[in-house]
Amino acid sequence: DGPYFIENKPAKVKGKGNIVNYIKGRINQPILIVKPNSGCDTKTIFSLLDYSNLSHPNMYKIEKAFEKNDFDTLANHVDNSLTDSAIKVNLDILDTINRLRACGFEIVNMTGSGSTVFAISNRKLPYKLYKKVLNKDNYEIIKIVNQI
């Protein structure tokens, strides 16, 4: 997840993060980034991954959503195959996801192998509510990035 935060562009990342293909287009909503105080060990997360039951997001639909600035399609297809494994190791991730969904964010997911979570909404209200449901003492980072 580092390359697209550095470049501020959406990207499809493969391999060990070393193959970066930027996606054309943008989604014009701000992105809330939340990092719990606790973390995850990437090696452990991958060791818990159930490869027989692995789902992958439809990257074609995600790329088209960015190209067309189609928030609803993006919301229906964003996924992270590592989330279930990471939650087994770190329940703070699930708590953060649940709190952000309760605020009304349509897209809530984990970045990379965790424990950072991102949230995006097509409405303004969730961006006002999150401050009430996230205790700053439990998080290293709570930041809004303008858009991707």
Language-model segment annotations:
Residues T116-S121:
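Short, amphipathic C-terminal "tail helix"
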